[in-house]
Design a protein with these regions (language model features):
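Conserved glycine-rich Rossmann-like NAD(P)H-binding loop of the short-chain dehydrogenase/reductase
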Residues: 1-12
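C-terminal helical subdomain
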Residues: 146-148, 152-153, 168-212
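Substrate-binding pocket helix/loop in short-chain dehydrogenase/reductase
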Residues: 66-67, 74-76
Length: 224
């Protein structure tokens, strides 16, 4: 089952996947920032498929601003989409996994969580992704004995519509990751033996995709 806000892209993608893999793909309109949409999503999934094996949270938005210029309306949007949505959806589905003695939750966080301190102009975005990564790790320790896997995938800068709105990104597309790299990471997380759980998977650009440092030199080396 696929869920997204955009009806046209959602239905197109569902059709492509159904034809490619010869399986039933059900598209469901959903805004991950809305609890009622998330509740409906889980209800429909169980009704249509009876058993859910995996939850993959890949919805996300970005906002690139110095904190003093951060649009106020962006902060709740980032919080609800990048943190509230995945956490709430995990809560709505976790008892189904417990009853079935297994399942997998995969959250797409961000490669920016590997940078310390958080990249300039992305501190709200990155701090929420760090919170989600911490949630994933804590959740695994709580539910591991139910046979439930929880994985954070931390991708670098990927060639998507989201990236297209960022500043200081290289025009050399070969420096940007393709979505297939993240797809491969998800497949790996789902293919490991039942007695193994990959807690974190980092998939980072081989060559820098940025045209300027994401952390100023003085910030990274305060004692020099």
């Amino acid at each position: 089952m696929l869920a997204a806000r955009g009806k046209e892209v959602l239905e197109k993608t569902a059709k492509e996947l159904s034809e490619k893999y010869k399986v039933k793909v059900l598209p469901v309109l959903c805004d991950v920032s809305q609890q009622k949409d998330l509740e409906n999503l889980v209800t429909v999934a169980i009704k249509e498929f009876e058993k859910i094996d995996a939850l993959i949270n890949s919805a996300g938005i970005s906002s690139q601003h110095p904190f003093q210029d951060q649009p106020l309306e962006d902060i709740p949007r980032l919080m609800y989409t990048n943190y509230f949505g995945p956490v709430m959806l995990s809560r709505l589905i976790i008892n189904h996994f417990i009853e079935n003695k297994g399942g997998a939750i995969i959250n797409i966080t961000s490669g920016s969580t590997l940078v310390d301190p958080p990249p300039r102009n992305f501190i709200v975005y990155t701090s929420l992704k760090q919170a989600l990564k911490a949630f994933d790790k804590g959740l695994f320790w709580e539910v591991r004995d139910f046979g439930i896997k929880v994985t954070s995938i931390m991708p670098g800068v990927t060639d998507t519509a989201l990236t297209g709105g960022l500043k200081d990104i290289s025009v050399d597309k070969s420096r940007l990751m393709k979505t297939e790299a993240i797809e491969d990471a998800v497949k790996f997380a789902l293919s490991v033996p039942a007695n193994v759980c990959p807690l974190e998977i980092s998939v980072i650009n081989q060559r820098t995709p940025w045209t300027r440092p994401v952390i100023p030199y003085k910030q990274a080396h305060p004692k020099e």
